[in-house]
Design a protein with these regions (language model features):
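Glycine- and other small-residue-rich loops at beta-strand/loop junctions that grip anionic moieties
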Residues: 189, 238, 261, 329, ...
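C-terminal structural cap/anchor segments
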Residues: 314-391, 396
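Catalytic-loop motifs flanking and including active-site residues across diverse enzymes
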Residues: 264, 268, 365, 400-406
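Active-site proximal loops enriched in glycine and acidic residues that flank catalytic Cys/His/Asp
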Residues: 249-251, 259-260, 308, 361-363, ...
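Short, conserved catalytic/metal-binding motifs centered on acidic residues
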Residues: 110, 272, 359
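Gly/Ser/Thr-rich active-site loops/lids in small-molecule metabolic enzymes
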Residues: 134-136, 261-274, 369-370, 377-385
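Glycine-rich phosphate-binding loop of actin/hexokinase-like ATP-binding domains
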Residues: 233-275
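Nucleotide/phosphate-binding catalytic cleft detector across ATP-hydrolyzing
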Residues: 1-236, 254-255, 265, 279-326, ...
């Protein structure tokens, strides 16, 4: 655990250095595309009313000065599969974004959806020594949290306090300075495979940059697409990526659970390619232009020219109906939604009073997805687009860029993490996530 704290604190120090230099690169490592933004920081933003505890909360105002997107290479299921290919793709997108910004950056923050994320709900309690809560008490109560056995080869990606209680007065955001006898904390911890982070750090180093932070794509997508009421009352953001589909549950403006399944839009494209006997590139084009999930009477008469370059005139000139295409696409999307629902049930999401679903990511733009999702997941479903940020190009305002925009918000205005405090070394056993979600529902 100490090694992890050192790694995370070192990245935070690099982030502070980037703030001082005034520029930072943001990188979204997707299986379909890699996106990059160059942010220029203008210093502390006095207009921000931060409700966080840590010293980095509400850090800086910023604007986008460079941006680029390139086709993903060397990335599968949200993590690096080929170091050389990934390095070339990252160099390409970084060079394009830096050229647009007309400046060079030395630090980079990245997000990814891979690594097999696992969520844990932790709880800790300490007695206040002088009755007035101080920074030392915050550190002590965090260190008293039950530490789970996360297993070999895994590291903590996020460890965020989501609720403080002082003498059973729950829902406190910042208890410092208040008077009481017992301080409780609830903390959400997200772990991933250590190899995923190590490969990313090594690849960034090969690109002559320093890794100044990492984040879950599910988490940052939620930060950019969920409106304030949804984050407060309870909602889940489902990010439909190319290689995987990730999701994050928010309550009281904090992420309390996250996970992913290894199915995404690329699997739909593959199904079309196999079903229509066409190359993957043609299948992707057909999916984008003509795809859908809810068939109507007119779709039986709506003909789609498949095309091809086999040399067989009849084969290359054949057509299929849109109903046939929907029949190929829908089973895979239903499988993804049913798998997500199963994991949300395990997490206890359906025990929350508010059950809103926000769909984002490239595949979320498929016509009829919101209707199909409302039948499988729940009634309150909408398609989410990222918040507008200063000087963000219009091309980056769609659902496919939710994680990229959310990562920019995360970089400038991070929430507190466990390692932001000086912690003594203590370990106990963990609580289950379902108990943690139920506790939050009953006490907040």
């Amino acid at each position: 655990m100490a090694d992890l704290y050192q790694l995370q604190r070192a990245m935070r120090a690099m982030r502070q250095s980037a703030f001082q230099r005034g520029a930072l690169a943001i990188l979204d490592l997707g299986s379909t595309k890699i996106g990059c933004l160059i942010l220029r920081f203008d210093g502390l933003d006095p207009s921000l009313d931060s409700d966080q505890v840590g010293s980095l909360a509400g850090q800086s105002s910023f604007q986008v000065v460079g941006s680029a997107i390139t086709r993903s290479r060397g990335i599968e299921f949200g993590e690096i599969s080929s170091m050389q290919e990934a390095e070339r793709a990252i160099r390409t997108v970084l060079q394009s974004a830096q050229k647009m910004a007309n400046l060079r950056v030395d630090h980079l923050i990245a997000c990814f959806s891979g690594g097999g994320p696992r969520s844990y709900g932790l709880n800790g309690v300490v007695k206040i020594e002088n009755q007035i809560v101080r920074d030392e008490d915050i550190a002590r109560v965090l260190s008293s949290c039950d530490l789970p056995d996360i297993g070999d080869g895994r590291e903590i990606l996020h460890a965020q306090p989501v609720n403080f209680a002082l003498d059973h007065r729950s829902g406190l955001v910042d208890p410092r300075g208040q008077i009481g006898n017992n301080l409780d904390v609830d903390l959400h911890m997200l772990t991933v495979r250590a190899k995923t982070i190590r490969d990313l750090a090594h690849c960034v180093k090969r690109c002559d940059l320093e890794l100044a932070g990492v984040a879950s794509a599910a988490y940052v997508s939620g930060r950019s697409t969920l409106v304030e009421d949804e984050q407060e009352l309870g909602a889940v953001c489902i990010d439909f990526g190319g290689g995987s589909t990730s999701y994050s549950i928010f309550l009281k403006k904090h992420m309390i659970f996250a996970g992913s399944i290894m199915l995404g839009g690329n699997h739909v494209t593959r199904d079309i390619s196999l079903g229509l006997q066409v190359p993957t590139a043609v299948a992707e084009k057909i999916k984008t232009r003509n795809g859908g999930l809810i068939a109507t009477g007119i779709d039986d008469r709506d003909l789609i020219e498949v095309g091809g370059e086999t040399g067989d005139w009849e084969h290359d000139r054949r057509t299929v109906t849109r109903s046939e295409l929907i029949g190929i696409m829908r089973p895979r999307i239903e499988e993804i939604l049913e798998d997500v629902r199963a994991q949300l049930e395990i997490a206890g999401f359906y025990e929350l009073k508010s059950q809103k679903f926000v769909l984002t990511g490239g595949t979320s733009q498929t016509p009829g997805l919101d209707t199909l999702a409302s039948r499988i997941l729940g009634q309150q479903v909408r398609i989410g687009r990222p918040l507008r940020i200063h000087r963000l190009p219009q091309a980056y305002s769609g659902s496919s860029c939710s994680a990229l925009v959310g990562l920019a918000l995360f970089a400038a205005h991070p929430q507190d993490e466990w390692w932001d405090f000086e912690l003594p070394n203590t370990s106990y056993s963990s609580r289950t996530v379902r108990k943690a979600v139920r506790w939050l529902r009953e006490n907040w």
